[in-house]
Amino acid sequence: MDRMASSMKQVSNPLPKVLSRRGVGAGMEAAERESFERTQTVSVNKAINTQEVAVKEKHARTCILGTHHEKGAQTFWSVVNRLPLSSNAMLCWKFCHVFHKLLRDGHPNVLKDSLRYKNELSDMSRMWGHLSEGYGQLCSIYLKLLRTRMEYHTKNPRFPGNLQMSDRQLDEAGESDVNNFFQLTVEMFDYLECELNLFQTVFNSLDMSRSVSVTTAGQCRLAPLIQVILDCSHLYDYTVKLLFKLHSCLPADTLQGHRDRFMEQFTKLKDLFQRSSNLQYFKRLIQIPQLPENPPNFLRASALSEHISPVVVIPAEVSSPDSEPVLEKDDLMDMDASQQTLFDNKFDDVFGSSLSSDPFNFNNQNGVNKDEKDHLIERLYREISGLTGQLDNMKIESQRAMLQLKGRVSELEAELAEQQHLGRQAMDDCEFLRTELDELKRQREDTEKAQRSLTEIERKAQANEQRYSKLKEKYSELVQNHADLLRKNAEVTKQVSVARQAQVDLEREKKELADSFARTQEQQDVLENLKHELATSRQELQVLHSNLETSAQSEAKWLTQIAELEKEQGSLATVAAQREEELSALRDQLESTQIKLAGAQESMCQQVKDQRKTLLAGIRKAAEREIQEALSQLEEPTLISCAGSTDHLLSKVSSVSSCLEQLEKNGSQYLACPEDISELLHSITLLAHLTGDTIIQGSATSLRAPPEPADSLTEACRQYGRETLAYLSSLEEEGTMENADVTALRNCLSRVKTLGEELLPRGLDIKQEELGDLVDKEMAATSAAIEAATTRIEEILSKSRAGDTGVKLEVNERILGSCTSLMQAIKVLVVASKDLQKEIVESGRGTASPKEFYAKNSRWTEGLISASKAVGWGATIMVDAADLVVQGKGKFEELMVCSREIAASTAQLVAASKVKANKGSLNLTQLQQASRGVNQATAAVVASTISGKSQIEETDSMDFSSMTLTQIKRQEMDSQVRVLELENDLQKERQKLGELRKKHYELAGVAEGWEEGTEASPSTVQEAIPDKE
């Protein structure tokens, strides 16, 4: 973004100098007014836009100059009122930034012209305050600050927009009335509070954990804070001075509230200045002052001399090139306009007004034979053009350098004035310290005199005591005098202590004065350096003047050479006339050649047109023959041995639909441009080939379908072939080609597609485009189900340890541990299956995407989906069964059956994954090892369940010691009956299980994706079930 330019400088304001260069009067003509308004409108719209970047300084400066130009802000508000500030937070934020700049650096009448919109700004602030995100809250606080600023400057018109005032002007603003100073301090506190709120809100809205100041979004929010920093530095300085003035007039208790509020704002401002100085964005744009470590002590009047006004410095060298005023460049171009026009007129007088109308331009007359004079003229012309450009550039650069040096001189003068001001302030402080030093010396002399008089009095008292010891009255008088002298001695001693403390303070102030003198000396050294730089700049300016004079001499030399060339021009006129006669003869010859060429082109075009018709007719007849052959094969008995695929038929239909769209497009292109016939011929040939394949594939597919759908499909293919022949016949002539319509062909294709989709197996209900995503989702769901099962087993084990003891706890730990091992083995199996599937897809898809591979092999894909669902479902059911067994509510047999069912599901997943895998694949070997691990884990679950069941039954064995022989015989018979019933039920359940498995594999044979020759039978999956089953 653009950097802040010198219009915001705190030390000096260059706007009056810019305005003096412009010299625009108050009364503008209509054309000038229209141009001014157009320029201002463009600048305002460029400065206030919806892009999240900082406002460009050159646009903001143009707006500021416009206010000084028209002595107000009417044009600015007329443009802003057309912007949707209430509906776009970014526009409102940038408007606040630009308006803040105008209030600071614009014409004083900007405030008067803006007061009428104060209520609108308040309403807009309340509206944006309802938004807590984005720029809404920032806009609300910024608008509140601008309204407070307008009210403050309205109440205190003595304060300029940039808040730069001297101490005398600050005293005049309060009119030497303590009540006015008190109220002015309160208003400054409110003003500074609004500035700090905006400062804090902007920082809170930024993510300070990263380099936010180097992003355009961060710079957009940070850019207005430069104006805030300038305002805060002045407000803080004036607040300190006013508080010292109030403390000199009012009691300290009365100003306690002022001191508390100042302490709060001092802490905030110091923290914000510290944080701002660390940002990279501010380091290259502004030098932020640092506040003292401790706040001023207003209870000590001498602390005012320790206060240093914070000065914000904006380096001039950070101004970007695009921030230079456009007006200066225009003025620079106007300075050389007359000289350039004079040179162009002279050049036109010598060589003519333009190259195209020059009768002596030999390049157009004869581009082959050039004599030495022609080359000389061209070379001199190029050299003159180059030197002219160099001269113009040198003039522009010299003028730009002069303007830059003038600006640098102005900046150095401003810095010199500031240094002089600081020097005068240091001299005033020095004079104040000298006065205090003289006062302390006088007090010290008085103290020494009192001490000498005290010594004399004591001596006299001792003499009187010896002389008049016998006189009691005189003695009493002397005692009284002695007591008085003692009191005086105490007072003098106290004065001596005060004098000593003052002497210590004097020494400290002397040291501070010496430091102040040292700083002043350093500032004088800096001033000398600046003067040296100024002298160097002036020397460079003199060198540029000398270079300019040298360039003028070179220009005179070239004008002399041009005059000599002008003399040679007359001698070349004769040669030009001869060349003109030769050119006329060549033109006649060219006309006769063009006539012959036109006749040859017409005959060639006719031959090409006839060849295109012949080629189109031949391709069309060949296509008709191919389709007729396909139609004749519908009744051929040779197709009985062929087995078609519905998937293949649907893919052929899709290809034909795409070919029809391309054929329509190519036909339109051929009608628009008959020369481009290659694409049309290719589309006709491709349509005939695909149509024949579709008809033959439809007939072959109907052989495996039921009779009624087969007849419908055959008739639909036959009708499609007839419609295709009719369409090809309409392509015979260009007149009939325009009326050719493929709607009937599309209807026939839709009929074939509908019949084909009805013949698809029930397992293909899912869209083929979604199969790839569904495989990934099901595998992820299986992994998640296994993880959830493992977590739940751990929770069940924790509950069992907390509530069970003895044999039951041992059995539960063994069973749940084996279940956890089984879950881990299944997890390894699922990961190996994913790796193998990825390898299969990568090796088999070619240039197609994975989703297209899954869609192409839909049956195999749905087999994977079914196997994954079965594994996840089995893991959930086994965890439920284990939970019931641990609680004593379930059966051990249910847990064994669930573990075997998981083994069967994993075997199904292995079988589905092995269908398309290479036998030598490393991932296949890992999958088989994982499958064996699952079998072992399943056997461990069954073994731990049987062992636990045995232990539980041993503990629950019946006690027959108290039973009689009859009772034991009775229970024996009951047990035999129960055994027979259970054996009968077992036989029936085994038969039912066999029927269920048979029906399951009949229904899932197609849906589980095993292709022909590799379909898994029930025996195949059964062999993969562990031996323990």
From Swiss-Prot:
Most abundantly expressed in brain. In brain, expressed in cortical tissue, hippocampus, the molecular layer of the cerebellum and olfactory bulb. Also expressed in spinal cord and bone marrow (at protein level). Expressed in reproductive tissues. SUPFAM superfamilies: ENTH/VHS domain, I/LWEQ domain. GO terms for molecular function: actin filament binding; AP-2 adaptor complex binding; clathrin binding; clathrin light chain binding; phosphatidylinositol binding; phosphatidylinositol-3,4-bisphosphate binding; phosphatidylinositol-3,5-bisphosphate binding; phosphatidylinositol-3-phosphate binding. Plays a role in clathrin-mediated endocytosis and trafficking. Involved in regulating AMPA receptor trafficking in the central nervous system in an NMDA-dependent manner. Regulates presynaptic nerve terminal activity. Enhances androgen receptor (AR)-mediated transcription. May act as a proapoptotic protein that induces cell death by acting through the intrinsic apoptosis pathway. Binds 3-phosphoinositides (via ENTH domain). May act through the ENTH domain to promote cell survival by stabilizing receptor tyrosine kinases following ligand-induced endocytosis. Residues 1009-1029 are annotated as: Disordered. Residues 410-491 are annotated as: pDED. Homodimer. Binds actin. Binds HTT (via N-terminus). This interaction is restricted to the brain. Binds to IFT57. In normal conditions, it poorly interacts with IFT57, HIP1 being strongly associated with HTT. However, in mutant HTT proteins with a long poly-Gln region, interaction between HTT and HIP1 is inhibited, promoting the interaction between HIP1 and IFT57. Interacts with CLTB (via N-terminus). Interacts (via coiled coil domain) with AR. Interacts with AP2A1, AP2A2, CLTC and HIP1R. Interacts with GRIA1, GRIN2A and GRIN2B. Residues 763-1004 form the I/LWEQ domain. InterPro entries: ANTH_dom, ENTH, ENTH_VHS, HIP1_clath-bd, I/LWEQ_dom_sf, ILWEQ_dom, Sla2_fam. The keyword Membrane applies. The keyword Isomerase does not apply. It comes from the Eukaryota. GO terms for cellular component: clathrin-coated vesicle; clathrin-coated vesicle membrane; cytoplasm; glutamatergic synapse; Golgi apparatus; nucleus; presynapse; Schaffer collateral - CA1 synapse. This is Huntingtin-interacting protein 1. It is found in: Cytoplasm; Nucleus; Endomembrane system; Cytoplasmic vesicle, Clathrin-coated vesicle membrane. Residues 32-160 form the ENTH domain. Gene3D superfamilies: 1.20.5.1700, 1.25.40.90, 6.10.250.920, I/LWEQ domain. One of its GO terms (biological process) is presynaptic modulation of chemical synaptic transmission. Belongs to the SLA2 family. Residues 859-916 are annotated as: Important for actin binding. Disruption phenotype: Mice develop a neurological phenotype by 3 months of age, characterized by wasting, tremor and a gait ataxia secondary to a rigid thoracolumbar kyphosis. Recovery of synaptic transmission following synaptic depression induced by prolonged nerve stimulation is reduced. Paired-pulse facilitation, a form of neuronal plasticity in which delivery of two stimuli within a second of each other produces an increase in the size of the second synaptic response, is enhanced. They also display micro-ophthalmia with nuclear cataracts. PANTHER family: HUNTINGTIN INTERACTING PROTEIN 1 (PTHR10407), HUNTINGTIN-INTERACTING PROTEIN 1 (PTHR10407:SF14).
